[in-house]
Regions:
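Bacterial N-terminal signal peptides
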Residues: 13-30
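Class I S-adenosyl-L-methionine-dependent methyltransferase module
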Residues: 45, 49, 55-66, 70-217, ...
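Class I SAM-dependent methyltransferase Rossmann-like catalytic core
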Residues: 197-263, 281-285
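Conserved Class I S-adenosyl-L-methionine
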Residues: 346, 458-490
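A short acidic, Gly/Pro-enriched loop at the edge of an enzyme's catalytic core
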Residues: 404-416
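A short SAM/SAH-binding and catalytic strip from SAM-dependent methyltransferases
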Residues: 414-428
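A short glycine-rich, Lys/Arg-flanked "PGG" loop and its adjoining helix->strand segment in the class I
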Residues: 431-443
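Conserved beta-strand signature within the Rossmann-like core of class I S-adenosyl-L-methionine
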Residues: 443-452
Length: 507
């Protein structure tokens, strides 16, 4: 995920044959006392299960009992297409930036997008880059691809036909859309994906700046993300705002003198994976997922859960994220390379709060070790974390689409965490997701997220999980060029004055 401001879209994706990989679920139960595997049962969302307020909101956009099943089917089909598109985005970003297959200079994708569009005539720009909220398809002939980019793409197309020991390259080689194609056909497909990805980047990074008002620009970018491919991008920084949100919960529990550790049954939706991000690709580090481990660390550090009671389930639409998390506890070497995506520089120093968070990160779940960085990354904070087997064995994952599905467990969740997932959803999809989340939470359970879309508050209220608190956190910067993230806390309750988990859980 790329950091900009609270609620900014940053980005979690899949192959186009999901059913083959649905068998790769919940294979991990590492300790004798470990709870049952993630999501004992997954069910499709039914119209009758929606809250009355949610039904009313959906009816305003033409979704009712008669066409609900068709709507769910359409969303599932669109999700599969967007997952494949997101994987192709990762492929393009890897091809432009990686040094694992070429000695050519890395190319920053946003800069490449700008150079590509700079070649267009005014008529082409008007057709391809208009600033309506629903941009039309744009076709740019491959001959327009700048030579430096074309050279990298050609070399990458050849590499995809060769044996490789690089984990990311191996993954791209096995994408069904590219498998068994000739070098020429692979180059043609990769070029087409490059043009599509660059068009989106230009719209987001440059066309959006043509608006006079921030609200109009935000609406334009939001519309772009509701159509783009699903990304698994994530960074270590993502955990900071969630930690601060959990700290607020802990402080309130202390102030209320609440007894018991009530946040031991946790669900993370879309934990993501650092695979091939749009910027700052670290291809010398294997693909990793950080968030489940960071959340476990925060819960234990803040004494919101006892180590022997922790259950941390994860659901993601991308099977490679699920596979990583389910296989992690089996590894002989359970290490995570934690590298901050932000450099600590004079012109934009890391905040004291974030630096303290990174220093303490992982101390409650494992043993930190030193990590030597390349010279050009020495201004970044980094460490190697060896995760304890007992903790790794309490993290489970399963493939699921929270818009159209929900988990059914013997005990509902105490806490659900969602970061940088909601921006990809339309209003209808967001309403459905919030209803599914509410159904998976116990009465008094909490939802933490970092989406700032204004309509979310009313949609969450209609789903029965009203907002109770929000806060903004400074990650880096001083008075100018500052970098923020934020967290909102919601609670499933029928009593407006109840703002902290209590006896309603029946525990």
């Amino acid at each position: 995920m790329r950091w900009q401001s609270f609620g900014s879209v940053i980005t979690t994706t899949i192959l186009d044959k999901l059913s083959v990989l649905l068998l790769c679920v919940c294979l991990l139960c590492a300790s004798a006392n470990a709870q049952s595997a993630c999501c004992a049962q997954i069910t499709a969302t039914q119209y009758e299960s929606l809250e009355p307020g949610a039904r009313a909101l959906l009816s305003e956009i033409g979704i009712g009992a008669a066409n609900f099943a068709l709507t769910i089917d359409a969303i599932n089909q669109q999700t599969q297409a967007r997952l494949l598109e997101g994987e192709m985005d990762h492929l393009v970003f890897f091809a432009l930036q990686s040094r694992r297959f070429t000695s050519r200079a890395a190319i920053e994708p946003a800069l490449s997008a700008y150079q590509l569009v700079a070649q267009l005539t005014p008529e082409e720009k008007a057709r391809c880059l208009n600033t309506e909220n629903q941009p039309p398809p744009c076709q740019i002939v491959s001959a327009r691809i700048p030579e430096a980019e074309a050279a990298r793409l050609r070399e990458f197309a050849q590499v995809l036909r060769q044996k490789s020991d690089d984990e990311r390259i191996q993954y791209f080689q096995n994408l069904p859309a590219l498998r068994n194609l000739s070098d020429r056909k692979i180059y043609e497909r990769v070029s087409a994906e490059y043009l599509r990805a660059m068009t989106f980047l230009y719209r987001k990074e440059f066309a959006a700046k043509s608006f006079l008002h921030d609200q109009e620009a935000a609406a334009y970018v939001a519309a772009l993300y509701q159509q783009r491919g699903h990304s698994t991008d994530t960074q270590v920084e993502a955990g900071f705002a969630i930690h601060e949100g959990l700290a607020a919960v802990s402080a309130r529990l202390t102030a209320e003198k609440s007894e018991g550790l009530l946040l031991d049954n946790v669900l993370i939706i879309g934990p993501g994976m650092d695979f091939a991000p749009r910027t700052d690709l670290l291809d010398w580090v294997p693909p990793q997922s950080y968030q489940p481990f960071a959340v476990a660390d925060s819960l234990l550090k803040l004494k919101l859960v006892a180590p022997d009671r922790l259950r941390l389930d994860c659901v993601d639409i991308n099977p490679r994220v699920v596979d990583f998390l389910n296989n992690f506890a089996r590894r002989n070497d359970r290490k995570l390379a934690l590298v901050s995506g932000l450099a600590d520089r004079t012109e934009r120093p890391l905040s004291a709060g974030y630096k303290n968070y990174f220093t303490q990160l992982g101390l409650s779940i494992g043993q930190p070790e030193s990590l030597r960085l390349p010279i050009d990354l020495r201004a970044h904070s980094a460490k190697l974390l060896r995760v304890e087997a007992a903790i790794a064995g309490r993290i489970h994952a399963r493939q699921m689409n929270v818009v159209t599905q929900r988990c059914v467990n013997a005990a509902p969740y105490d806490l659900v965490i969602v970061t940088n997932v909601f921006p990809y959803f339309s209003s209808a999809e967001l309403a459905l997701a919030l209803n599914n989340i509410a159904a998976m939470l116990r009465e008094g359970g909490l939802l933490l997220h970092n989406e700032s879309r204004p309509e979310l508050a009313s949609l969450a209220q209609a789903a029965g999980v009203p907002a109770i608190q929000s806060r903004t956190v400074l990650i880096a910067g001083a008075q100018k060029n500052s970098l923020f993230d934020g967290v909102a806390i919601h609670q499933k309750t029928r009593i407006a004055t109840s703002v902290i988990p209590g006896s309603a859980s029946g525990r």
